From Swiss-Prot:
N-terminal signal peptide: none
An annotated GO cellular component: cytoplasm
Organism: Pseudoalteromonas atlantica (strain T6c / ATCC BAA-1087)
Protein name: 3-hydroxyacyl-[acyl-carrier-protein] dehydratase FabZ
Catalytic site positions: H54
CDD domains: FabZ (cd01288)
NCBIfam families: fabZ (TIGR01750), PRK00006.1 (NF000582)
Length: 148
């Protein structure tokens, strides 16, 4: 458990998200402002299951998993903002996705996600993934809030 009021450790993340190994892609939330933004990270290790086939001898963390990590951070922000754990956040669309640099074992993938707008259960976000302060992925995406 993390003591800072605007941080969440893995225990709190597990209480909010339905994802579990090997698909939980957040290690810690470092800051959030309800209804506005969230920052989080995932440590990328050689033990990630995706590296078995992506790519043997040259492991690169898949771009689609970076997008999923951004969406999971957005989901935490949504759950914390809306306060309803009976809902599920589902991807509804991805726009303007760009992959700028590869992410490899040993990197810390930092995520910065900002809420653009929310209307009728559709949340639109802008997310940036970075490593060592350098953007590796950027996208706008939408999540739909639905009952389980």
């Amino acid at each position: 458990m993390v003591n800072n009021i605007n941080q969440l450790g893995i225990e709190e993340i597990l209480e909010l998200l339905p994802h579990r190994y090997p698909f939980l892609l957040l290690d810690r939330v470092t800051d959030y402002t309800l209804g506005e933004s969230i920052t989080a990270y995932k440590n990328i290790t050689f033990n990630e299951p995706c590296f078995t086939g992506h790519f043997p001898g040259k492991p690169i963390f898949p771009g689609v998993l970076i997008l999923e990590a951004l969406a999971q951070a957005a989901g935490v922000l949504g759950f914390k903002t809306a306060g309803n754990s009976d809902d599920l956040y589902l991807y509804a669309g991805i726009d303007k996705a760009r992959f700028k640099h590869p992410v490899v074992p040993g990197d810390r993938l930092d995520m910065d996600v900002r809420l653009i707008k929310e209307r009728r259960g559709i949340w639109k976000f802008h997310g940036v993934g970075s490593v060592d302060g350098k953007a590796v992925c950027e996208a706008e995406f939408m999540c739909a809030m639905r009952k389980l």
